[in-house]
Amino acid sequence: CKEDSKEVRIQRAKMLMAAVLLAQGIPFIHSGQEFARSKHGLPNTYEESDEINKLDYMRRNQYQEIVNITKDLIRIRKEHAVLRYCMKEDVEQHVSFADIAQKVLMYKIRDEHDDMVIIFNPTGEHFSYEFEEAYPLIYYNGASEDILIKKVNIEPYSTIIFSRNDFLKPEGTVF
């Protein structure tokens, strides 16, 4: 990743933060991750000085966008119980996966109150996906939206969240 531009590294950091906060289970955010903590390119800083391992709180202002996205994703996680299943059986029953071009991860979480689709594009490529019917878009790379989308353009290093609260599609409906 060192050869990537700073912009690409920031996009990846935002997407990876989303992956942590939108995964089932208890999310673990390493100290300073929300403001792109750096250890100056050193691979293992366990025995390094406090100068290397300290939290540089000035980065919070520099990376405010990641801080804000972290807050938004925590809010979304709190608002949607389907993102907080505790039991393996619940995950197996309510979560299904699909892929787009074998590069983009898309998963659906559905119960009697929520019908949610989450898309992660970890590549530098653009993709598109068309749903059978329009879905309410609630989050696109840090922007909170509230519009219906049938066809979505999936930007590089992006996170996209769709949700229909209090809605259940009939059993047997295709993903």
Each model region followed by its residue ranges:
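Active-site clefts of carbohydrate-active enzymes
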Residues: 1-5
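Carbohydrate-interacting/catalytic domains
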Residues: 6-10, 21-29, 33-175
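Short, acidic/polar
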Residues: 12-17
